[in-house]
Swiss-Prot record:
InterPro entries: Cyclin (IPR039361), Cyclin-like_dom (IPR013763), Cyclin-like_sf (IPR036915), Cyclin_C-dom (IPR004367), Cyclin_N (IPR006671), Cyclins_cyclin-box (IPR048258). One of its GO terms (cellular component) is cyclin-dependent protein kinase holoenzyme complex. This is G1/S-specific cyclin-D2. Residues 264-289 are annotated as: Disordered.
Amino acid sequence: MELLCGEVEPVRRAVPDANLLHDDRVLQNLLTIEERYLPQCSYFKCVQKDIQPYMRRMVATWMLEVCEEQKCEEEVFPLAINYLDRFLAGVPTPKTHLQLLGAVCMFLASKLKETIPLTAEKLCIYTDNSIKPQELLEWELVVLGKLKWNLAAVTPHDFIEHILRKLPQPSEKLSLIRKHAQTFIALCATDFKFAMYPPSMIATGSVGAAICGLQQDEDVSSLTGDALVDLLAKITNTDVDCLKACQEQIEVVLLNSLQQYRQDQGDGSKSEDELDQASTPTDVRDIDL
């Protein structure tokens, strides 16, 4: 007789507030304040002497894998990357402290967005115990001070529902478009070239790339090509040419990620367990442009 209780209490989430989603003032306020939370410079050129772009990409990929394995809310990873970039834009940091900084940023973002946030002990385990919980807690205060406790940053996820609501999409397709757009946002967060893009542009480009990638199904959208881009640009007051360029860059990043995944899959030296680990954002392998 099995006495072990296997019940798992579901995570409690607030339902979407229609009053907020249908009030254009909310979207306008997001557009007004979003640039306050961007890094102030391309910090590899003028601030960081020890950290290189590939190091940032490695720690961002590690952070994404941790968030996926812990089934964090979609907003946690981009928000943590926002903290990381803003800190690095102002504070010269040794490369030996980069993973510690990434862990602290996830720690803070999960406190803001998760019902049950990540613990310091769990994050230390993900670093193979190369950092101690007390060290993480001490650095938490350092990061908070440098960010001036300004943690409620605007991220691309804040725009997704506002954009989807204004598109002439079949309701049954919205969840798939949303899922793909969230994947693109995660991909953008791992690539520094998007670090200084406004969140609204990343969100708009991600939605556009998601719809274009799903247009193999004729019923996905009543808008295509330039008409779709024009509508998306109008929703978020984005320059059309800038939006097209952003969407093209997102698609290139996706293709590079897919190619890397296929190379890893074909590498006979990798074990099946290694291949099963999340090395690309959720469902990237299921997306076809």
